[in-house]
Amino acid sequence: MLTAHHLDVARRHNVILRDLSLSIEPGRVTALLGRNGAGKSTLLKTFAGELTGSVAPNGVRVTGDITLNGEPLACIDARRLACLRAVLPQAAQPAFPFSVDEIVLLGRYPHVRRGGATSHRDRDIAWQALERADADALVGRDVTTLSGGELARVQFARVLAQLWPDDDAMEAGPRYLLLDEPTAALDLAHQHRLLDTVRAVAREWRLGVLAIVHDPNLAARHADSIALLADGTIVAHGTPRDVMTPAHIAQCYGFAVKMVETGDGAPPVMVPA
């Protein structure tokens, strides 16, 4: 399990997260929701290990405990951590004209022996990851020529390649996928396809997934659990049906909604009241 316990994060005098506790369970998708500036990306970066130790930005102070499979996150070296968790940030725009294939192969480098090169197996995994991300038609393209949605799917393939299961990976224990607004640049169909894939690999590969999603209806349909972030802490965490209530949404967003049952067994759809 990937767990934050009594987490506090401050940037100089600005408290961003306060006394926050949350666990990401293997095999399940947790959607993180909250208004702009609530601290969602900060929480994800903290879970990723990007705000502690030598990589901590100036002025950032983090207290509390974060453990990955029972081990303090700060004690895991960078290479092993890259084999245990993958991160898809909001803006992953390459500055150089790499090919789609090269970008996805970057996900395999934590698994390459020091001083070695990617293998035929790595290239096969990259191709399979592109297929699962519905990005295989983009192979050979210069990534600087891709649309925002095309690039998002390629970057999603990269993190799939990073966590692709093999014997060594499975022996290392549960692994984790951290996604910061993975659907933001995608059209309607690709939003649902990507989150369908996320849920499928969470179960197949025993991944714990934390995904920041802005659309509550999208989150409710695809996540196993939802965590609502407000005032620097988790104000509700549970199943979509339990969390996505008018009272919780009003508390989190200051916006009135009502719930409409769809009749297909899925959680109710949220509409303005």
Swiss-Prot record:
Where is this gene product found? Cell inner membrane
- Detail the disulphide connectivity of this chain as listed in its UniProt entry: none
What the entry lists under NCBIfam families is as follows: PRK13547.1 (NF010067), PRK13548.1 (NF010068)
Q: How does it assemble?
A: The complex is composed of two ATP-binding proteins (HmuV), two transmembrane proteins (HmuU) and a solute-binding protein (HmuT).
Task: Write out the entry's keywords from A to Z.
Answer: ATP-binding, Cell inner membrane, Cell membrane, Membrane, Nucleotide-binding, Translocase, Transport
Q: Which residues form the ABC transporter domain?
A: 2-256
Q: Which family does it belong to?
A: Belongs to the ABC transporter superfamily. Heme (hemin) importer (TC 3.A.1.14.5) family.
Q: What is this protein called?
A: Hemin import ATP-binding protein HmuV
| Molecular function, one GO term | ATP hydrolysis activity
- Supply the EC number(s): 7.6.2.-
- Cross-referenced InterPro entries: AAA+_ATPase, ABC_transporter-like_ATP-bd, ABC_transporter-like_CS, P-loop_NTPase
How is this protein positioned relative to the membrane?
A: Peripheral membrane protein
Where along the chain is ATP bound?
G34, R35, N36, G37, A38, G39, K40, S41
Q: Which Gene3D superfamilies match?
A: P-loop containing nucleotide triphosphate hydrolases
| Subcellular location, principal | membrane
Q: Name one GO cellular component term.
A: plasma membrane
- Briefly, what is this protein's role? Part of the ABC transporter complex HmuTUV involved in hemin import. Responsible for energy coupling to the transport system.
